Amino acid sequence: MNNKSTNNLQDIFLNSARKNKIPVAIHLTNGFQMRGSVKGFDSFTVILESDGKQMMIYKHAVSTITPLRPILFNQPQQDEE
């Protein structure tokens, strides 16, 4: 899989979690787990909001992102809000 496809899948996943306000659990490479809502993201970071606080998490420190509800990939993507 080429890098552009991988980034596109990341974008679809994170954007769906953000737009649909699906809570996620982010597992870091050091073993910590953070739960919250995705507020934004770019090529290198994810902004997670939890208990009214925002955290900027670097993607290189992320092991796994688990949505707490299913994210449907077969729905057509709408333009960015």
From Swiss-Prot:
Q: Name one Pfam family in it.
A: Hfq
SUPFAM superfamilies, alphabetically?
Answer: Sm-like ribonucleoproteins
Q: Keywords in alphabetical order, please.
A: RNA-binding, Stress response
A single GO CC term for this protein reads: cytosol
By its UniProt entry, which InterPro entries does this protein fall under?
Hfq, LSM_dom_sf, Sm
One GO molecular function term of this record is:
RNA binding
State any GO BP term from the record: regulation of RNA stability
Domain Sm stretches: 11-71
Oligomeric and partner information: Homohexamer.
Function statement: RNA chaperone that binds small regulatory RNA (sRNAs) and mRNAs to facilitate mRNA translational regulation in response to envelope stress, environmental stress and changes in metabolite concentrations. Also binds with high specificity to tRNAs.
Q: Record's family?
A: Belongs to the Hfq family.
The protein, known as: RNA-binding protein Hfq
What organism is this sequence from? Clostridium acetobutylicum (strain ATCC 824 / DSM 792 / JCM 1419 / IAM 19013 / LMG 5710 / NBRC 13948 / NRRL B-527 / VKM B-1787 / 2291 / W)
